[in-house]
């Protein structure tokens, strides 16, 4: 849960009672993250059932990425061979394709042979011993410079025992990671057709291996235009912003991420002034998308903020933060007697409800009341006061702390 993607479906695989790979004990000592201890599978649905459900729900064919044994997919295809029609291709990391060998194959060789013979297209990605992609301190430094939570976690883990020692000894290489490189830069790989539906690929030469290190960092950095339609990236240069906004830019982006900054800027331009509840709506919308780990335009929203300012101003932030706009028909304003800073978010039949915690709502009311006492209601000095409050809340309010979350509600 350390990345706040709690809504991403997780399933527990079937035990095959195979011997653990040689590195299992060592890997168990690595600090992978907050949820690393939840390895028993208790409370999770069966992986095969989750895969089958997901394949059935997707509108387009799926690229199925496998970084371990093929047991779960084998169970799905054996139960319902037609499920393979929903898969565009399988991209599987395995140590060797010719002949088949390595932990991912040997853990469940029956499953691997079945899937490879199923007729579903399979690309087997393997490391090339002649040109390994070594995880060096310089590569970890490059990863650490990428400004997102994933890169920071990777860098911190590899700078901490026991991985730090292995990095220093140049023992670690990119193995499973090569699947991501292949998906984003297939031109770096040489490909051999093994039969009509199965092919093997590995990095073609040392030049490709060197380029793979650069591509790994680029993959973590992501596309600058992943959320924008007109911008390539989003401007954060101080020269483009009002003088009172400039001091918070770097800190707000570092603390809350570029996605929240982008949505906050666009919302307040749309809203007509730098508003408190508009900014709360942004944070709420981004948090909901983060929970499901989805992009914009993918979520249904019901807001309980009503139609009357100031609370209804939250609706503008919700639209921009989620992409669930009135024009797309993805947001509904509930007709209620007492508006409140609360909204429901639904994605693929799963729903969460976010509510601004009372202590934050009370703080906003007290601060706004103080402004009215000092400057009068809706006067120009009052709006300047509200603007300063909104900037302070934008920077100080952490979207992971200010909302109560109710799942399936």
Which residues does each PLM region occupy?
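N-terminal acidic, glycine/proline-rich low-complexity segments
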Residues: 1-233, 408
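Generic detection of long, well-ordered alpha-helical segments
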Residues: 206-210, 278, 308
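Active-site nucleophilic cysteine motif
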Residues: 172-181, 273-283
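Non-transmembrane, aqueous-exposed alpha-helical and coiled segments at domain scale
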Residues: 222-274, 280-409
């Amino acid at each position: 849960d350390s990345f706040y993607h709690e809504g991403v479906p997780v399933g527990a695989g079937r035990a095959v009672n195979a011997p653990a790979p040689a590195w299992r004990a060592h890997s168990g000592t690595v600090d992978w993250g907050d949820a690393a201890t939840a390895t028993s599978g208790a409370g999770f649905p069966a992986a095969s059932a989750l895969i089958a459900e997901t394949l059935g729900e997707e509108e387009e064919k799926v690229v199925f990425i496998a970084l371990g044994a093929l047991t779960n997919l084998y169970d799905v295809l054996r139960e319902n061979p037609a499920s393979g029609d929903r898969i565009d291709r399988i991209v599987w990391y395995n140590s060797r394709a010719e002949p088949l060998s390595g932990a991912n194959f040997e853990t469940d060789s029956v499953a691997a042979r079945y899937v490879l013979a199923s007729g579903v297209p399979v690309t087997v990605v393997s490391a090339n011993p002649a040109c390994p992609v070594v995880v060096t301190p310089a590569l970890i430094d490059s990863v650490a410079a990428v400004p997102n939570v994933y890169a920071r976690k990777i860098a911190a883990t590899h700078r901490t025992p026991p991985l730090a020692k292995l990095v220093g000894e140049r023992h670690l290489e990119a193995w499973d990671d090569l699947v991501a490189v292949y998906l984003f830069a297939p031109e770096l790989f040489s490909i051999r057709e093994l039969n009509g539906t199965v092919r093997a690929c590995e990095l073609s030469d040392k030049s490709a291996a060197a380029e793979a290190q650069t591509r790994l960092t680029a993959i973590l950095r992501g596309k600058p235009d992943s959320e924008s339609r007109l911008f390539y990236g989003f401007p954060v240069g101080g020269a483009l912003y009002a003088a009172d906004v400039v001091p918070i830019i770097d800190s707000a982006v570092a603390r809350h991420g570029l996605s929240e900054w982008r949505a906050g800027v666009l919302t307040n331009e749309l809203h007509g002034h730098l508003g408190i509840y508009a900014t709360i709506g942004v944070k709420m919308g981004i948090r909901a998308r983060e929970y499901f780990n989805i992009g914009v335009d993918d979520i249904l929203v019901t807001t309980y903020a009503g139609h009357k300012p100031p609370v209804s101003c939250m609706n503008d932030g919700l639209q921009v933060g989620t992409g669930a706009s009135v024009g797309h028909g993805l947001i509904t304003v509930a007709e209620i007697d007492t508006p409140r800073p609360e909204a429901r978010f639904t994605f693929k039949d799963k729903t969460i409800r976010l509510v601004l915690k009372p202590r934050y709502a009370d703080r906003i009311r007290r601060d706004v009341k103080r402004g009215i006492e000092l400057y009068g209601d809706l006067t120009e000095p009052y709006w300047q006061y509200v603007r300063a409050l909104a900037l302070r809340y934008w920077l100080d309010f952490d979207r992971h702390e200010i909302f109560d979350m109710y799942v399936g509600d």
